[in-house]
Amino acid sequence: MKNILNTLAITVTVFLLPSHALQAQKKAAPIFVDGMTQVVPEFKDPANWIIQDLWVETEFDSDGDGKLDRMHVDVTRPKQTETEGLKLPVIYESSPYFAGTGTGDLKYFWDPKQELNTQPKPRLRFPPIEPRINRPVISKGFVDQWVPQGYIVVHSSSPGTGLSQGCPTVGGDNESLAPKAVIDWLNGRAKGYTTPDGNEEVKAYWTTGKVGMTGTSYNGTLPVAAATTGVDGLEVIIPVAPNTSYYHYYRTNGLIRHPGGWLGEDIDVLYDFIHSNPEHCAWCDSVIRDREMIGHHDRVNGDYNDFWAGRDYLNDMGPMKAALLMCHGFNDWNVVPEHSYRIYNAVRAKGLPCKIYYHQGGHGGEPPAEMMNKWFAHFLHGIDNDALEGPKAWIVRENDKPDQPTGYADFPNPEAKPVKLYPTPGTPRLGGLTTERKTGQGKETFMDNVSFSGSSLAQAEWTNHRLLYVTAELKEPVHLSGIPSITIRLACNKPAANLSVWMVSLPWTESWRPKPTDNIINRGWADPQNYKSLTQSEPLVPGKFYEITFNLQPDDQIIPAGKKIALMIFSSDRDFTLWPEPGTELTVDLDGTSIVIPVVGGADAWGRAVGK
């Protein structure tokens, strides 16, 4: 009986202990359900995270001190990467903004009141930035979201910002090589140190070396920059509203065009806005800002040159091998939608895994959390899920929520076909816009006056400051998908003029809080002096007619029945262009002017919509 009791006691003990003893034996690890990472209880408590910072040595010296620049990096990882030998992949964000930025006071920007083809007035220099230096945490971004789900989160300040050495170059090579160095360090190919100038090394023994990058705006640009280096270990990037060419950010078709909301900004202004590390400030300001940027960005003509070509990531796509989930808003007039499409198009042509997510809003806006989760789980954890299955393009329709996109075979919609529309006379009121090409339509003249906004001109029933051509009222919705292209034959009474084009839907929707898809369908700008070449402008001969063709922005929008689609041609766009004195006259030859719009269903769909 005594032996039986002893046996029972042992058995009871075994069944009482598993919740503690067996749990202690089981190591924490990522959890996957339906192809997605889940919150791991052992990773959830921030008190159990290891947070450290360090400096990673790069392969460049951008501040002229004779030493390789080091980038300030922070790391947040579950303690199990230290106590249990667990290795996890990395989600990495790099930014020039982490330590703070300069003033947004427009008095330090370039004055938009500038006559065309003239030297601008010197601008005021920014007051020094008072950096926000936090150690060991550079940023808390993405930490609460991804560390509990089985990732290590890494941040770095880009060159010349925060505690990172070097100079900001705003799209220069060092801004690509800096995140490359961090990824190299995560894979044991570069050195990390405990201090910016010491020799005590830090090694990344706690990671698998697989890295995904993400971020918005400038923080979305840097994943593209890193990917163009072809660095091993960077498996996937999810850029949101990235600036992929600084020429396309500050110029359009030869025209000086400011990003929406930042009138007077140029690349040297952005340099001042982000240059938060005061080390070597005088050298960086003199060599990078004044000599390289102001010396070559050309605020007189706006031509494309070697300076701008060196800051266009489309020119560096050859080595790229990371997968791409591109994200943008069709109504982003800060970083316009062409920035994302041109890179997506190039990656698609390379045959790399890629998809694109577009919403109808403005600047920023991540893809749905489930979509990001699946992409990171697939490429960083190796989970076999449906991240790459199904539609190539996910587009949020006009009245849907951002996390409820509609899938399409691709963007542009493969069913979209070009429909060419021709203007008929009507100035100073409204002209027509039709698929019927008629000769002898004559010429119409308008006068530039930057005092009037584009929206006021579009709403005006009578004005001599724009030309406005309107289709018949739509009897059915029209689905536009792709990139409109316009050809204008024009003459000017001066050697230079701004040229702006809007597509709008009429009647104009009056609302104290309009939706992004209300009213303005698309926009485009160009310098008529660049009618032959983007790299060499040519002063216009007053009275002589020139033909210029250029694209508007990528778009996917459904224009509802009851609306009319209108083409507005005007000169200075007060929210984007320079502001010359009013009075320049532009004359448009209607016989030589047309716009091609991409309509899903092509001419048949268009004919049904306008009743023909």
Q: Could you tell me what each predicted segment is?
A:
Residues M320, M326-H328, D332:
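Short beta-strand/loop motif that positions the catalytic acidic residue
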Residues I91-P96, H155, W185, M568:
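Structural cue for short, hydrophobic secondary-structure segments
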Residues W333-H339:
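Conserved alpha/beta-hydrolase "acid-adjacent" motif
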Residues K27, G35-V40, E366-K612:
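C-terminal, loop-rich substrate-recognition/catalytic regions characterized by aromatic stacking residues
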Residues K27-P30, V40-P41, E59-D61, L68, ...:
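Accessory cap/linker subdomain of secreted extracellular hydrolases
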Residues Q25-E115, E130-P131, K140-F142, G431-S456:
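Catalytic-loop region of hydrolases
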Residues V147-L163:
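Conserved alpha/beta-hydrolase
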Residues V347-G364:
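Catalytic histidine neighborhood in serine/cysteine hydrolases
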